[in-house]
Structure formats: structure tokens, C-alpha cells
Curated annotation (Swiss-Prot):
SUPFAM superfamilies: Ribosomal proteins S24e, L23 and L15e (SSF54189). Residues 171-192 have a biased composition (Basic residues). Pfam families: Ribosomal_L15e (PF00827). Gene3D superfamilies: Ribosomal protein l15e. Residues 193-204 have a biased composition (Polar residues). It comes from Arabidopsis thaliana (Mouse-ear cress). GO terms for biological process: translation. PANTHER family: LARGE RIBOSOMAL SUBUNIT PROTEIN EL15Y-RELATED, RIBOSOMAL PROTEIN L15. This is Large ribosomal subunit protein eL15y. Belongs to the eukaryotic ribosomal protein eL15 family. InterPro entries: Rbsml_eL15_core_dom_sf, Ribosomal_eL15, Ribosomal_eL15_CS, Ribosomal_uL23/eL15/eS24_sf. GO terms for cellular component: cytosol; cytosolic large ribosomal subunit; nucleolus. One of its GO terms (molecular function) is mRNA binding. Keywords: Ribonucleoprotein, Ribosomal protein.
Amino acid sequence: MGAYKYVSELWRKKQSDVMRFLQRVRCWEYRQQPSIVRLVRPTRPDKARRLGYKAKQGFVVYRVRVRRGGRKRPVPKGIVYGKPTNQGVTQLKFQRSKRSVAEERAGRKLGGLRVVNSYWLNEDSTYKYYEIILVDPAHNAVRNDPRINWICNPVHKHRELRGLTSEGKKNRGLRGKGHNNHKNRPSRRATWKKNNSISLRRYR
């Protein structure tokens, strides 16, 4: 068994005494640092490698802190216009996951880099922590690598803002395949619009 197998087994048993203590200490450390921090190497090397990370030039890892809880509607003094049924301010549920929010924040802050993937790292009562894998599309080590140079194409700018990363596709309901997922393609909204708009052909 290789070393990564042991590491992944450790992370599978998060409730073990070792991992509980380690995660608690790390959480305290993360709270003292800024919300977006560059790391020297990934905290979970086995997970990072599975998601596309390589320990070579052009690849970087950032840790992002996201506040837990629901999303409050950003209205001044709670003044919402419209019908009473739509006047909620609190108890609204954001339609995307915290992980996709973390990817978005990293992508906005680091505009010259491209988001490859991300994974869960830690959480406490107030925050969730994720590590984001990014690559530099201008670096020759990335441009000359046939396994990753697809991301250098301009069409992949800000994938995380358009729901094109793994987590973004999951939030859009595009993870599944087959006849059970016909109503998710090309998107849930497009299918709804097609099914709810009347198209009457002209009689000639």
C-alpha cells in the first residue's frame, strides 16, 4: 500500500481521536489568518492529486474561508417591494453550495489564474474551509502539458463564475446521465421554459 492510501484512510475516519484533535488545532490556526491564503502545498495531497493537482510550476493551492449559514436578502432595512409572498428577507436558501462560493471568491481575487477544482478541508460552528486548486495559464509548464493545457484556452476564463467546475455542474444538476436526467438538460430553467411556453405554428 502506498503512502497516499494511508493518508486517504486517515481522512476517511474524521471522527478518530487523532483527526479530531488535528482538525480542532488547525481550525484555530485558520481562524487567525485571512479568508484567502496561499499555501505552499495542499493539506490533503491525496485528494488534491485526484482532482488534478500536480506538484509542478504553474499549479497553486489557496485556502478559502466561507461563513456558514443561510443567505440574507441584501435589502436596506428589510424593505422589500412586491407581493407579501415574496417579501422574505431571512430564512432564504442560497441555491449554490459553500464550496462553489469559495471557488468564486478565489477566482475573483486571482483573476489571472484558472480554477481547476476544490475540496472540503475543515469546518467549525461559524466557517467552512476549502482548498482551491488553480493554474497559471501563462506559465510554460502548464501550456506545454497536454493533460492540462486545455485550460489555457480563452473559453475557460472564469469557469467558476459560470458553473463549469465540478461543483458548479453539481449545483446545476448536471452530474447525472441517462433518461432520469432528461429534464436537467440543457439546464433546468431551459427545460422549464420549453415546457411552459406555447409555440403555435403559423397556418399557411
